[in-house]
């Protein structure tokens, strides 16, 4: 069974809370340049088997969504999202700032239905003038949705 879950609908694991208590009074460098990020970078380099990898951490979801979506799409592509999708309603224009269009399709209780996506793609591909349109290059799906579904 596939289960797409998030970190917002449960409390922290007791070991995480304990570690926060243990390190609460520590003074470290700023985020990305502290001993914990340095240790994480080393582990990522080991996992990637690349001692020269450049590792950067992002501090929030908006920055992450904008960076990842921009890195995936070509300049002529956009991202399909339901009209109520997080990137369309609560990302403060960050996707558009990267010069990519959010291509809206209707939501059903906050979710993207496969038949809606299939219908959109069939119509897009059948359009003889689609070379003048933003091409869909990515589909954005979230859980939970903005409606909590």
Segments (PLM) and residue ranges:
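General beta-strand structural signal in soluble alpha/beta enzymes
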Residues: 3-6, 55-59, 81-82, 141, ...
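Short polar catalytic/cofactor-binding loops
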Residues: 8-11
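Conserved N-terminal alpha-helix of the aminotransferase class I/II PLP-enzyme fold
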Residues: 13-61, 83-88, 94
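Solvent-exposed alpha-helices and their adjacent loops that cap or buttress functional pockets
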Residues: 47-50, 72, 94-97, 129-134
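Conserved core of the PLP fold type I
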Residues: 54-73, 103-110
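Conserved PLP-anchoring active-site segment centered on the Schiff-base-forming lysine
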Residues: 71-89
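PLP-dependent aminotransferase-class I/II
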Residues: 99-149
